[in-house]
Amino acid sequence: MLEDKAVVVFSGGQDSTTCLFWAKERYRSLHAVIFDYGQRHKEEIQCAVDIANEQGVPYKVFDMGLLNQLTANALTRENISVQAGEAGESPSTFVAGRNHLFLSFAAVYAREMGAKHIITGVCETDFSGYPDCRDVFVKSLNVTLNLAMDEQFVIHTPLMWLNKKETWALADKMGQLEYIRAKTLTCYEGIRGDGCGTCPSCQLRQNGLDLYLREKAGAGQ
């Protein structure tokens, strides 16, 4: 039986698009929230809008430009290069407070829409330097939001314990692997589909896809 309403935190990337399809199988009414936080590549926002339109999912684009004023990182500043974190430090692509703020604003929107369910694509496999992708953070924020608004929100994280190979497997199970591969934007250089192939995000995505396709081919023999 399908649940009533849900809100998806949506970026047009592999993970959030996988979650969008996951949510479409479970909710009668679905809304996507897209955040413009001053990211270097506006193509990300357009990609999310295009996918939402193609899938018939109503969406809102919210201006979160203040976040760009508060914190400097490689996703919003041209003069900061993409670098992995060293010695326990966060990578240059970490946007401090992003998931905290996005989920908080998504909850406010969900309340106005009469929705109790909020879906996000964060996962522990992304934790390396990204503290706001941890399960403990999401559960803590879920409690805080319910106390703050006297609501009964449930934040769903379908990918929390999946690696990239398993995320591709989920996409394939839903019949959306090729769509997600071709239409989404994960690349730090702002290139849709398989991307530039060299940035850390593209490499993580491609390695997961290669592992899944090899495993699938082996199982079919």
UniProtKB/Swiss-Prot annotation:
Binds 1 zinc ion per subunit. It is an enzyme of class 6 (ligase). It comes from Shouchella clausii (strain KSM-K16). Zn(2+) binds at C187, C196, C199, C202. Keywords: ATP-binding, Ligase, Metal-binding, Nucleotide-binding, Queuosine biosynthesis, Zinc. CDD domains: QueC-like. The keyword Ligase applies. It comes from the Bacteria. The lineage of its organism: Bacteria, Bacillati, Bacillota, Bacilli, Bacillales. The keyword Signal does not apply. This is 7-cyano-7-deazaguanine synthase. Belongs to the QueC family. GO terms for biological process: queuosine biosynthetic process. Homodimer. The gene is queC. Pathway: Purine metabolism; 7-cyano-7-deazaguanine biosynthesis. ATP binds at F10, S11, G12, G13, Q14, D15, S16, T17, T18, C19, L20.
